[in-house]
């Protein structure tokens, strides 16, 4: 007795209300301003009853430059050490893209870069 395969119909969701996976990447040199923007984004998403994952704290990149203090090369060999730390956070949202436009319209502090990636 072999069972015949059944055709299963999946309900079609319209493109206007389709739910996307949206990844918001925040980078900054200032940790305090970065955390403030993360908190504002997450609070706005939770007010809209969206599914939120994050903020995921990525490893801090430390850029270092070591250079001689004297331009002519004479004298004792003294060195200057400069460094810049870049902090990164990732927030994942599951929502329609129209709602994300409302959420990302918050005041973003200077020095914080925002990158929004939409995937299906």
From Swiss-Prot:
The keyword tRNA-binding does not apply. Transmembrane segments: none annotated. PROSITE patterns: RIBOSOMAL_S10 (PS00361). The modification Phosphoserine is found at residues 16, 18. The keyword Lipoprotein does not apply. GO terms for cellular component: cytosolic ribosome; cytosolic small ribosomal subunit; small ribosomal subunit. One of its GO terms (biological process) is cytoplasmic translation. Expressed ubiquitously in embryos, highest expression is in the midgut. One of its GO terms (molecular function) is RNA binding. Keywords: Phosphoprotein, Ribonucleoprotein, Ribosomal protein. Pfam families: Ribosomal_S10. InterPro entries: Ribosomal_uS10, Ribosomal_uS10_CS, Ribosomal_uS10_dom, Ribosomal_uS10_dom_sf, Ribosomal_uS10_euk/arc. Belongs to the universal ribosomal protein uS10 family. NCBIfam families: uS10_euk_arch. This is Small ribosomal subunit protein uS10. It comes from Drosophila melanogaster.
């Amino acid at each position: 007795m072999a069972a015949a395969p059944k055709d299963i119909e999946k309900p079609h969701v319209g493109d206007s209300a389709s739910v996307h996976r949206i990844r918001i990447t925040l980078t900054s040199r200032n940790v305090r301003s970065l955390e403030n923007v993360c908190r504002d984004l997450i609070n706005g998403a939770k007010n809209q009853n969206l599914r939120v994952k994050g903020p995921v704290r990525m490893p801090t990149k430390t850029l270092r430059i070591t250079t001689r203090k004297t331009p002519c090369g004479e004298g004792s060999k003294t060195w200057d050490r400069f460094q810049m730390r870049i902090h990164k956070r990732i927030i994942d949202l599951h929502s329609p893209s129209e709602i994300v436009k409302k959420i990302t319209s918050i005041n973003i502090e200077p020095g914080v870069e925002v990158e929004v990636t939409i995937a299906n």
